[in-house]
Amino acid sequence: MDYSHQTSLVPCGQDKYISKNELLLHLKTYNLYYEGQNLQLRHREEEDEFIVEGLLNISWGLRRPIRLQMQDDNERIRPPPSSSSWHSGCNLGAQGTTLKPLTVPKVQISEVDAPPEGDQMPSSTDSRGLKPLQEDTPQLMRTRSDVGVRRRGNVRTPSDQRRIRRHRFSINGHFYNHKTSVFTPAYGSVTNVRINSTMTTPQVLKLLLNKFKIENSAEEFALYVVHTSGEKQKLKATDYPLIARILQGPCEQISKVFLMEKDQVEEVTYDVAQYIKFEMPVLKSFIQKLQEEEDREVKKLMRKYTVLRLMIRQRLEEIAETPATI
């Protein structure tokens, strides 16, 4: 396709556009830089709309801890066994057969406490495989399966251990439990999210927070393009972070996209950023030079307006001396 005469524009912010031709050139440079890596971007046209999609690297720049969800939304929570199941013997026996519940009303306590002389309790087992209660143990009101349930509760089975491991998730290679209430990612560590060029800054923020199950509101954070010079440019709510990354260039040694607290970071313009790297003595010398230049400009303006004031006064005197004509 010949793009030489193409005039279609791609939005890159509120009332800001870039030609598709220029964006394709930036995209080509971007993909050449990440050739053979999963950070390469793809583009397509959908209903005459030019869409770029792929992974966006975002660096953590948080100073305060973030709150993590106590439970995973996708986790299946098994309810604890009810009190009736602990005393009914409804679990599987040792041979895999289900034992029927032994109900308390069938045990005749009066016969156990006062048996007639010479009579003995039958020693044979009933059809359920359970022996009747003996004379000297009237207080045991549980079945053998109940004992098994209690014993297994004190030991973690391999399935329980696997379930506990599934509670854990990774942030930049470090595993944390969902039940951990707060966490602060290492400053400068990198993560990524899969987005497209139609997603605005708030949408990207929500996607990133949902990825790591962070409870904090997206309103607390902002995305910044941070340059090695110290310049910090906040992405507006109407900006498209993926487009901004493409236009900044692929090299993260020059600029990175940071997630930061909205109320903790101030934007730094290019004019200010070019002085950040200097030492204090050098900066003081700059201030002195600027002060001297300011003084020279002030004196120049004072001389200029002094001359103008004298000229105006001289003209007023000339008008006053001239007789009025009728």
UniProtKB/Swiss-Prot annotation:
InterPro entries: RA_dom, RASSF1-6, RASSF2_RA, SARAH_dom, Ubiquitin-like_domsf
Organism encoding this protein: Homo sapiens
Annotated stretches, region: Disordered: 111-133
SMART domains the record matches: RA
Entry-linked SUPFAM superfamilies: Ubiquitin-like
One Gene Ontology biological process: regulation of osteoblast differentiation
Superkingdom, taxonomy of origin: Eukaryota
Listed name of the protein: Ras association domain-containing protein 2
Domain Ras-associating, first and last residues per copy: 176-264
Principal localisation: nucleus
Gene: RASSF2
Alphabetized CDD domains for the sequence: RA_RASSF2, SARAH_RASSF2
Localization in the cell: Nucleus; Cytoplasm; Chromosome, Centromere, Kinetochore
SARAH domain sequence ranges: 272-319
